[in-house]
């Protein structure tokens, strides 16, 4: 695809990628290409990719199916879990409907129990994530889980995964990570060249671009164009620079970003799952492939592991590189691990970097938009 001269039009294309991807998925199914659905960045996409499958992020960012989910699940459960289950149960997510296999993971107790019910209407493989990532036993367990996933994928799709195919998938996925990282590193420029809303459109929309080569080329061209325009003086006005951390990006993050940027701030970076957490580190392309995969995915700084030094290290790196003025921690209601860890994040940000921090607990509804705007406006005014 040739680069459109109007950059906002490109950002909107990425924003619409999820809806447009529905037709692409139907075409993939008609061509007999397997589809693997996933909910988490801990899932090693390289393994199903090596079997010729396409990996898709499943719909779990809106509240429209939560009422149906609550017929089976507790009301006081994380909205991400209820939304994930609801979209699957109601067949309102075409990506879930067309998935031949869903790969889950034990990142939290609510999720792993939800997968038991999901398995009643969709083939589900659950990866057992170790609670700690600091010892050899945890690494051995996670490597074994990689091999168990390989076996499941091979049996499910009747396609043996060769080492060469896996190395090719690793190399391709690494190129995608680097292209995404180069794009969101644009937020390090000061003043920023684009808004956090536009960054979010591209980073989230990229998960629904299934032609990896085309995606990489488009990201590279767009990044070069934005950087060139910034060097020519096309920059946003100086404002307080905000880093978002916390729960996975989705409907909740979108309204938080909107509140920040409508009240005088710019979101310049995302530490969340769809942002730096997933793409900043690549898989080693030498040595044992499963050791390399285990090492990369165990390095993800998620609140479900303890201790979670990786998250603190990533935050410190981003606070410095993005010249951050304040940190906003987005916590989904009833997400206990991120809620409990918020104290450690607050201490780290304030004591190690001497910058303001605010924790925002929210869900996928719009009921708190007014209150959210008021709190965010007061926070930014303080900056």
Q: What role is predicted for each listed range?
A:
Residues 3, 343-383:
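Peripheral docking tails and interdomain loops at the edges
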Residues 76-92, 303-317:
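Glycine-rich, highly charged phosphate/nucleotide-binding loops
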Residues 35, 100-101, 326:
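Structural motif
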């Amino acid at each position: 695809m040739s680069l459109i001269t109007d950059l906002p039009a490109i950002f909107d294309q990425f924003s619409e990628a999820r809806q447009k991807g529905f037709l692409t998925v139907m075409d993939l199914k008609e061509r007999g290409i397997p589809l693997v659905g996933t909910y988490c960045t801990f899932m090693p996409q390289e393994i199903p990719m090596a079997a010729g499958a396409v990996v898709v992020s499943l719909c779990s960012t809106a509240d429209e199916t939560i009422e149906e989910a609550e017929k089976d699940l507790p009301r006081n459960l994380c909205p991400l879990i209820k939304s994930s289950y609801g979209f699957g149960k109601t067949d309102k997510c075409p990506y879930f409907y067309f998935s031949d296999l869903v790969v889950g993971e034990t990142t939290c107790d609510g999720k792993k129990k939800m997968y038991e019910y999901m398995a009643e209407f969709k083939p589900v493989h659950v990866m057992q994530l170790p609670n700690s990532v600091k010892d050899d036993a945890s690494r051995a367990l996670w490597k074994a889980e990689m091999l168990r996933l390989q076996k499941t994928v091979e049996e499910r799709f009747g396609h043996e995964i060769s080492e060469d195919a896996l190395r090719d998938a690793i190399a391709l996925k690494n190129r995608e990570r680097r292209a995404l990282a180069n794009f969101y590193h644009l937020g390090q420029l000061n003043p920023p060249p684009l808004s956090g809303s536009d960054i979010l459109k591209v980073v989230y929309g990229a998960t629904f671009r299934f032609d990896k080569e085309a995606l990489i080329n488009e990201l590279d061209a767009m990044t070069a164009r934005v950087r060139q325009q910034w060097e020519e003086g096309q920059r946003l006005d100086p404002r307080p620079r905000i880093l978002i951390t916390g729960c996975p990006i989705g409907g909740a993050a979108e309204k938080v970003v909107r509140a920040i940027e409508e009240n005088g701030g710019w979101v310049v970076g995302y530490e969340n799952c769809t942002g730096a957490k997933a793409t900043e580190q690549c898989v080693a392309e030498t040595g044992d492939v499963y050791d390399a995969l285990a090492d990369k995915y165990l390095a993800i700084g998620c609140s479900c592991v303890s201790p979670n030094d990786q998250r603190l290290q990533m935050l410190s790196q981003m606070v410095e590189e993005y010249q951050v003025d304040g940190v906003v921690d987005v916590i989904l209601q009833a997400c206990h691990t991120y809620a409990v860890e918020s104290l450690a994040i607050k201490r780290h940000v304030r004591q190690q970097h001497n910058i303001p921090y605010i924790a925002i607990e929210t869900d996928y509804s719009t009921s708190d938009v007014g209150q959210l705007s008021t709190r965010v406006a007061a926070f930014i005014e303080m900056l």
